[in-house]
Every structure is written in structure tokens, then in C-alpha cells.
């Protein structure tokens, strides 16, 4: 994720602040007014999303959450209280420092890389080495470590295994 793009939803002024400070010059930042376009681009182009949570847009959180994408929620702590976060989500209470934001972005990038490296595609199945699960569509099966190791061995083998 060295060429990371940060999608900002819910606060256009923050994009202007980032551009003015040039703190995140190694990242590209884009503001979105349209929720669907923000989610579509985040999924298609592997963007990290900064979602500024307000009382008015708090209900959009579930749409972001259902997409399983890297997301940083930024809000006053009262707006973040009852939001259950997934593994690819972080939250920042306002006010926050730019150093704190940069640290949170770095942590989330590391989580995404770790998650991406733990997934193996095997035909129509996805093997998650960390969670020791195999998934197909909406079905998932918990496996033992030995079963996971066998599946990984099979996935790496070019020839049939006797």
C-alpha cells in the first residue's frame, strides 16, 4: 500500500487542510460527497477511508462496515460510543493531532497487509491462515492448524499429491 489513496467522506475542509499541510505527501487524498461512489472506489482501488461521523451521517457506518474495507472513524467520542468496530477499522476521537492520524493510518495499513498476506485463494475457496477458516460465498468452516497446513500444501503443489 505504498501508493495509498485516502478517501475522505463527511468533511471536505479536512482535505484542504491535508493539502495545505502537505504532511501526507506520500498519499493521495480524495474527498467524496457521494457515499456509494466513495465505497465503490474504496473497494475497486483499495482506498483507505476516513469517515467523519456526525449525527446526520451516523447511519452510513453500517454500509461501510458491511464492505469490510480499511476505515478510520473520526468523531467526537459521544458519536463513536455504540459503534462496534471490525478488525480493519480504527477510530479517532476529535480533536486529534496529525501525528496521531498518521500513526493510526500506519497501524491500519499494517493490519490490511497482515490480513491480505493471510488469505490464500484456492479455486472458489478462500483460506484464512490466521483465523484458520476456509470460506466459500457466505459459508465458512473452522479448521485445525493441521488441516490448514494440508490445504496450503495442496494449494502450492503443481502436481497431484499421492
How does the language model describe each region?
Residues 11-14, 34-36, 53-57, 74-81:
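Short, polar loop motifs at secondary-structure junctions
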Residues 33-47:
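Acidic, metal-coordinating helix/loop segments flanking the phosphotransfer/catalytic sites
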Residues 107-148, 152-157:
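Short, Lys/Arg-enriched segments at the junction into DNA-binding effector domains
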Residues 161-162:
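Short acidic, hydrophobic short linear motifs in intrinsically disordered regions
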Amino acid at each position: 500500500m505504498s501508493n495509498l489513496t485516502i478517501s475522505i467522506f463527511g468533511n471536505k475542509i479536512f482535505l484542504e487542510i491535508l493539502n495545505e499541510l502537505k504532511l501526507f505527501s506520500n498519499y493521495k487524498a480524495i474527498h467524496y460527497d457521494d457515499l456509494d461512489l466513495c465505497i465503490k472506489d474504496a473497494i475497486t482501488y483499495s482506498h483507505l477511508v476516513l469517515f467523519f461521523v456526525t449525527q446526520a451521517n451516523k447511519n452510513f457506518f453500517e454500509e461501510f462496515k458491511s464492505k469490510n474495507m480499511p476505515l478510520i472513524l473520526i468523531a467526537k467520542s459521544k458519536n463513536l460510543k455504540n459503534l462496534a468496530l471490525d478488525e480493519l477499522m480504527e477510530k479517532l476521537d476529535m480533536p486529534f493531532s496529525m501525528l496521531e492520524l498518521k500513526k493510526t493510518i500506519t497501524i491500519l495499513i499494517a493490519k490490511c497487509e497482515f490480513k491480505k498476506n493471510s488469505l490464500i485463494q484456492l479455486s472458489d475457496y478462500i483460506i484464512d491462515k490466521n483465523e484458520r477458516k476456509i470460506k466459500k460465498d457466505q459459508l465458512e468452516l473452522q479448521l485445525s492448524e493441521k488441516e490448514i497446513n494440508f490445504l496450503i500444501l495442496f494449494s502450492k503443489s503443481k502436481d497431484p499429491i499421492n
